[in-house]
Each structure stands twice: as structure tokens, then as C-alpha cells.
């Protein structure tokens, strides 16, 4: 469930200088007596292994109504893959952007997910052509943005120390989708399907 977070944090005062002696204080930065209010946009931050991020991702992916854009570094979780197939079966276009080396290694070890997607209409996959990492772990369906450190692997979603941030902030969603479209349009991408 999403919530509205408002955080009031005191900024460090003069004591900061002992750790950063050459750091000058910008004029726009509040003094230690001021408070700073964080964004009040709806967001939720979740952590594994305390929470099962796989269930959170699946529940929110299933709510996709218009499209689903995914940039995922590692992707070996079959339950998440099935949720994506279910979304595509409803006629919703799904675009998946992957890191080249990670995708190739996963195909060599276990091509199950790629084979599942290959049999499914409405799923398009592109792999970054460059050897520079595509290290994002994010998705958007136009109404929700998920970002964080958690890859889509069973261990990454359930056992490792990872985070997933979910937000409905329209500006954040637009920013991700703009960046995703730029990545998707690269001329050196490999079109998988």
C-alpha cells in the first residue's frame, strides 16, 4: 500500500566542517536551525529479506492497464515472468530492455524465461548493444514506477539485502519513461523479439 511520506530532517551544522574542511556551505542550503521537508509524493520503500519483493512486484505489475516498460539487469525469476505474460495476454504491450552480457549468460544457463516470452504476443525485448552495463532494476506502467537495487532473481527479491521503491509521482514516471524510450531507441540495440 502506498503512503504519503513527509520527513523533517535537521541538517548538520558547524560540526560538518570537521569532516569536510574544504567544503563551503552553499547560500541556498538551510542552516542547522532550519528544517527541510521531503517530498510529499506517494511512495513506498520496501526491503528484502524482511519483505518478499517478488510478491510486491507481481501484485503491482498485475495492475498494469496501458503498457509495461521494464529495464532489468538480472531476470531469472519465473513467477515475475509469468505475471508479465499474464499482463501481455490481456493485450497490454510489454517492452523489456536488458543488459547484453547478463542476458547472454542467462540464456546459456537457463533459457526458460526467453522461451516463455517468445511464445507470447505483446512482448518486445531489446538488449543493449554496447558492453557498457545497463544496470537498472526498474519498471513503469504509466501509473507506477518501481526502482531500486533488487534484480528479478529469487535470491534478489527474497533473500538478499535489497530495496524496491514504488512511487506514483507523475514527474518521476515521465522521467523514467523518457529515459527508457531513449535506451529503447538506441541504434546498436539487439532486437530479440
Regions found by a protein language model. Name each.
Residues 19-22, 103-135:
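Ligand-binding grooves and catalytic loops that recognize ribose/phosphate and carbohydrate rings
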Residues 69-72, 95-98, 126-127, 140, ...:
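Structural recognition of the beta-strand scaffold that forms the well-ordered cores
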Residues 43-49, 70-73, 123-125:
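Short, flexible loop segments at the rims of nucleotide/cofactor-binding pockets, characterized by
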Amino acid at each position: 500500500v502506498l503512503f504519503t511520506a513527509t520527513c523533517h530532517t535537521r541538517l548538520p551544522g558547524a560540526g560538518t566542517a570537521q569532516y569536510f574542511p574544504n567544503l563551503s556551505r552553499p547560500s541556498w542550503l538551510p542552516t542547522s536551525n532550519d528544517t527541510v521537508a521531503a517530498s510529499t509524493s506517494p511512495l513506498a520503500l520496501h526491503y528484502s529479506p524482511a519483505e518478499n519483493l517478488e510478491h510486491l512486484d507481481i501484485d503491482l505489475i498485475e495492475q498494469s492497464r496501458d503498457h509495461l516498460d521494464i529495464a532489468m539487469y538480472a531476470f531469472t525469476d519465473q513467477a515475475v515472468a509469468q505475471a508479465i505474460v499474464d499482463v501481455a495476454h490481456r493485450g497490454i504491450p510489454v517492452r523489456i530492455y536488458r543488459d547484453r552480457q547478463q542476458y547472454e549468460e542467462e540464456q546459456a544457463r537457463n533459457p526458460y524465461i526467453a522461451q516463455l516470452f517468445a511464445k507470447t504476443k505483446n512482448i518486445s525485448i531489446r538488449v543493449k548493444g554496447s558492453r557498457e552495463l545497463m544496470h537498472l532494476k526498474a519498471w513503469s506502467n504509466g501509473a507506477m514506477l518501481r526502482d531500486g537495487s533488487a534484480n528479478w532473481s529469487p535470491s534478489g527479491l527474497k533473500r538478499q539485502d535489497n530495496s524496491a521503491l514504488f512511487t506514483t509521482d507523475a514527474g518521476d514516471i515521465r522521467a523514467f519513461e523518457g529515459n527508457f524510450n531513449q535506451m529503447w531507441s538506441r541504434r546498436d540495440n539487439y532486437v530479440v523479439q
